[in-house]
Amino acid sequence: MWNMLIVAMCLALLGCLQAQELQGHVSIILLGATGDLAKKYLWQGLFQLYLDEAGRGHSFSFHGAALTAPKQGQELMAKALESLSCPKDMAPSHCAEHKDQFLQLSQYRQLKTAEDYQALNKDIEAQLQHAGLREAGRIFYFSVPPFAYEDIARNINSSCRPGPGAWLRVVLEKPFGHDHFSAQQLATELGTFFQEEEMYRVDHYLGKQAVAQILPFRDQNRKALDGLWNRHHVERVEIIMKETVDAEGRTSFYEEYGVIRDVLQNHLTEVLTLVAMELPHNVSSAEAVLRHKLQVFQALRGLQRGSAVVGQYQSYSEQVRRELQKPDSFHSLTPTFAAVLVHIDNLRWEGVPFILMSGKALDERVGYARILFKNQACCVQSEKHWAAAQSQCLPRQLVFHIGHGDLGSPAVLVSRNLFRPSLPSSWKEMEGPPGLRLFGSPLSDYYAYSPVRERDAHSVLLSHIFHGRKNFFITTENLLASWNFWTPLLESLAHKAPRLYPGGAENGRLLDFEFSSGRLFFSQQQPEQLVPGPGPAPMPSDFQVLRAKYRESPLVSAWSEELISKLANDIEATAVRAVRRFGQFHLALSGGSSPVALFQQLATAHYGFPWAHTHLWLVDERCVPLSDPESNFQGLQAHLLQHVRIPYYNIHPMPVHLQQRLCAEEDQGAQIYAREISALVANSSFDLVLLGMGADGHTASLFPQSPTGLDGEQLVVLTTSPSQPHRRMSLSLPLINRAKKVAVLVMGRMKREITTLVSRVGHEPKKWPISGVLPHSGQLVWYMDYDAFLG
């Protein structure tokens, strides 16, 4: 086999010399050469690379590697190579000749131990010496699970690096971690063996021809798009990948990752950055593209649990039980469908909804990025007189059609009433079947273009790897920015039960969703059960708002949405009474995730709220800059303040950032806030204070055994949290208890245990700070959803 490879390399060298000056030899090592990805895409991609490059000055050798013993591995690899095919326009005789050459240049070898890698390196060097070839570089393609990366990387680094003057390129396939922490860990491990410029992380969506065309299209059509590509003209952006197949046969992978990690965090996020980034002057510059992508990540508004809806096809749990030998009682919470609402808080995109959606067992297989423009025209003539190329009353949209669907191919679609686009010569105008409608319009209403020659994504990316084009791959910085954005949402959804759907056409309208004020929700209500059991599930309306007592104070309990609505109504009623009586309303609000839905409800459904006469105060604040995503004020700004007309001088953030320092005792930030309260709030008695309750019984930022804030004369104190950021500023318990009304909002199954515990304890604020909340002359009301109250 070794002698045959030498002969084949010499023949290839002769062909290169006849073609043009020899540029060196490239060894390509495919790890996982007998796996599914290699069989379906990678060997064909390598063959296409050979067809494209063999006559242009380089010689090649291909090493298929796996853990399998040599004889069996060679048989498996030979079987995978049987399906290689040539482009349709290549003559059969030429195809057979090139295929034969490729097979001769390809050999299998077992790579299992450090000695195996050392032997590979010696063989490559010996082959180069015998053939008299100069080494240009080596490509190691990791088509293996991530847990194998570290050992392989160590062996390559220690014994398989090419000599001086030759390059090394290491290709990595997703998944690149499970969350931000694991991605950081994996990146650190790989960084000990390889330089950043040596690593090529593959997201095969970046090899899709329609996706790869987004930046060039924007660049070629700058003049037409400059005035349109912004919040004033774009109504929304949809980035979609739908599949008809389910996860059968892949549930071990899917149980660990789910649809958000599998598709949204990588493929759809990459498309989002290409659509939303500021256009670099040079769209071919990897450094410029990365810099502009990172600017998008920095502007992304943080995701909350309400930013997403999730579903799961009905047979998924049964498939998991069967394939992973789970007990009959096992029910998976892994989503197979997800839609997420993303907002970008910058001048170009502020207020424009970006919808990312993907799912399995849906009604069609299709992928696209659709930019829908606002229709701001009013046409006088009747609809029958509207012309597609002229009427501004017809839909105006730009679609990067990634593939499949009714169109069946990659395409770029531009509404004729938008502009006539410019595309490179590698794209041609296309004609679809008569009567075909796409996105609400007949195909004839679009300028439609498709690639002159369709290419598989992996073939495209292998060519980019060979030529060292880094702008088509995921850098470490890009990867970690993406995980930093998605990890909080994944954590918030970890215990959320997905909506079940039958799959395919039977889904009907079950997965249809709507969005409003930063929240996404299903259009149709689904029955929920208070306690799982046989028989029909009761509807939320079957359970009225429950009124009872909790710790001798009034309790309001309901399903979460109804509870939030009730609390918002109560706050508005309290505000109206206070303004009518005193001319103003002083409201102190807590941060965290629980009040987000309340803020959104107040911002979108309470048009009679007396915001002009309302003063907003903070119950507590983390010692971070107010612009920090961890800041309670930043959450209040994102979900409430920017949506209501409240005078800026009525907004009172806590002064945690003074003298360019955070919560320094000598800056007296707590005393400053206390004096402000005393000056503006009569008797330092807030009209309403909204609190939450932590799993440890803390409230505000008053934690168990806190040395300050639980008693004494101080109105505002600095405290220390057991979780980061540790330093906090908080209203004290004595100040809270001066309020006319205190509302405690408790939501979620995670609070069930502490809710039960606190119901049984007495007045023990040192141990359970929440137990010390009891207004001296005001009212305390508990608001608990059924998950927290009943479990």
Curated annotation (Swiss-Prot):
GO BP terms in the entry = glucose metabolic process; pentose-phosphate shunt, oxidative branch; regulation of cortisol biosynthetic process; response to alcohol; response to nutrient levels
Q: Which residues are glycosylated?
A: 157, 282, 683
Stretches the record annotates as 6-phosphogluconolactonase: 541-791
Q: Indicate where the modification N6-succinyllysine is found in the sequence.
A: 208
Region listing for Linker, in residue ranges: 527-540
Amino acids binding D-glucose 6-phosphate: 174, 204-208, 243, 262, 360, 365
Leader sequence residues = 1-19
Keywords assigned by UniProt?
A: Carbohydrate metabolism, Disease variant, Endoplasmic reticulum, Glucose metabolism, Glycoprotein, Hydrolase, Multifunctional enzyme, NAD, NADP, Oxidoreductase, Pyrrolidone carboxylic acid, Signal
Q: Which cysteines are joined by disulfide bonds?
A: none
Q: Provide the catalytic activity annotation.
A: D-glucose 6-phosphate + NADP(+) = 6-phospho-D-glucono-1,5-lactone + NADPH + H(+); D-glucose 6-phosphate + NAD(+) = 6-phospho-D-glucono-1,5-lactone + NADH + H(+); 6-phospho-D-glucono-1,5-lactone + H2O = 6-phospho-D-gluconate + H(+); 2-deoxy-D-glucose 6-phosphate + NAD(+) = 2-deoxy-6-phospho-D-glucono-1,5-lactone + NADH + H(+)
Q: In which pathway does it act?
A: Carbohydrate degradation; pentose phosphate pathway; D-ribulose 5-phosphate from D-glucose 6-phosphate (oxidative stage): step 1/3; Carbohydrate degradation; pentose phosphate pathway; D-ribulose 5-phosphate from D-glucose 6-phosphate (oxidative stage): step 2/3; Carbohydrate degradation; pentose phosphate pathway; D-ribulose 5-phosphate from D-glucose 6-phosphate (oxidative stage)
Catalytic residues (positions): 267
Which positions in this protein are listed as binding NADP(+) 2? Answer: 370, 617
Question: Which tissues is this protein detected in according to the database?
Answer: Present in most tissues examined, strongest in liver.
Q: Which residues carry this modification: Pyrrolidone carboxylic acid?
A: 20
Instruction: Name the positions where NADP(+) 1 binds.
Output: 32-39, 149, 174
Q: Where in the cell is it found?
A: Endoplasmic reticulum lumen
Q: Give the enzyme's EC designation.
A: 1.1.1.47, 1.1.1.363, 3.1.1.31
| Superkingdom of source | Eukaryota
Q: Which GO terms describe its molecular function?
A: 6-phosphogluconolactonase activity; carbohydrate binding; glucose 1-dehydrogenase (NAD+) activity; glucose 1-dehydrogenase (NADP+) activity; glucose-6-phosphate dehydrogenase activity; NADP binding
Pathology linked to this chain's protein: Cortisone reductase deficiency 1: An autosomal recessive error of cortisone metabolism characterized by a failure to regenerate cortisol from cortisone, resulting in increased cortisol clearance, activation of the hypothalamic-pituitary axis and ACTH-mediated adrenal androgen excess. Clinical features include hyperandrogenism resulting in hirsutism, oligo-amenorrhea, and infertility in females and premature pseudopuberty in males.
Q: How does it assemble?
A: Homodimer.
User: What job does this protein perform?
Assistant: Bifunctional enzyme localized in the lumen of the endoplasmic reticulum that catalyzes the first two steps of the oxidative branch of the pentose phosphate pathway/shunt, an alternative to glycolysis and a major source of reducing power and metabolic intermediates for biosynthetic processes. Has a hexose-6-phosphate dehydrogenase activity, with broad substrate specificity compared to glucose-6-phosphate 1-dehydrogenase/G6PD, and catalyzes the first step of the pentose phosphate pathway.
Family to which this protein belongs: In the N-terminal section; belongs to the glucose-6-phosphate dehydrogenase family.
Q: What is this protein called?
A: GDH/6PGL endoplasmic bifunctional protein
**Organism this protein belongs to:** Homo sapiens (Human)
